[in-house]
Amino acid sequence: MSSYFVNPLFSKYKGGESLEPTYYDCRFPQSVSRSHALVYGPGTTAPTFQHPSHHVQEFFHHGTSSISNSGYQQNPCALACHGDASKFYGYEALPRQSLYGAQQETTVVQYPDCKSSSNSNSSEGQGHLNQNSSPSLMFPWMRPHAPGRRSGRQTYSRYQTLELEKEFLFNPYLTRKRRIEVSHALGLTERQVKIWFQNRRMKWKKENNKDKLPGARDEEKTEEEGNEEEEKEEEEKEESKD
């Protein structure tokens, strides 16, 4: 029984030829990939691959047309992959670090005042920071207050206390208008007068009956006197009828 299957590669490759593809692989050249492992010793030197830069240009400009026309007969790996990685794709024409250094030097040369002004500004800024950090320029409101620290108590003169006592006995609760008048007359603030009256009322409640303030007692006395007078008048009317 005969088979009509024919391998299509037989017509392209002759007997004894390798069937490996001829396209290039940029990892290693063909000679290196097929060779055995190299052993480096103290007496041996590492192989160097040198390739002129004009081959790279030939690969980009003429290699593409030759590869497409010749059917991959020319191996471009021998042209492109044997050179140094830094010189591949024309990297040797871009001096990056030297270009940056030259640009920085030219800017300093063209504008010499900028460097001196920047140095002076930095020194002045450090001086201001040192001055601000000094404790001698700390304002009172910037200093942290100790826990439990209280402000000093207001001391009243004898004349002020006497006038405030008189006002308290007359009326323990001051209106806003009367409070302003008393504060102006005694040379005190409205808040100081208010606090003094609050403390005086608390003291009065502790010393006497809690529900009876001086003004309240006076009102009760007037009410009791009025009730007694009414009772007397009623008794006199009843006696006159009899």
Curated annotation (Swiss-Prot):
A motif (Antp-type hexapeptide) lies at residues 138-143. Residues 149-208 bind DNA. Residues 221-242 have a biased composition (Acidic residues). SMART domains: HOX. GO terms for cellular component: microtubule cytoskeleton; nucleoplasm; nucleus. GO terms for biological process: anterior/posterior pattern specification; negative regulation of transcription by RNA polymerase II; neuron differentiation; regulation of transcription by RNA polymerase II; skeletal system morphogenesis. The keyword DNA-binding applies. Residues 206-220 have a biased composition (Basic and acidic residues). SUPFAM superfamilies: Homeodomain-like. Residues 112-154, 206-242 are annotated as: Disordered. Keywords: Developmental protein, DNA-binding, Homeobox, Nucleus, Transcription, Transcription regulation. It comes from the Eukaryota. Its main location: nucleus. It is found in: Nucleus. Residues 124-136 have a biased composition (Polar residues). GO terms for molecular function: DNA-binding transcription factor activity, RNA polymerase II-specific; RNA polymerase II transcription regulatory region sequence-specific DNA binding. The keyword Zinc does not apply. Sequence-specific transcription factor which is part of a developmental regulatory system that provides cells with specific positional identities on the anterior-posterior axis. Belongs to the Antp homeobox family. This is Homeobox protein Hox-C8. It comes from Gallus gallus (Chicken). The lineage of its organism: Eukaryota, Metazoa, Chordata, Craniata, Vertebrata.
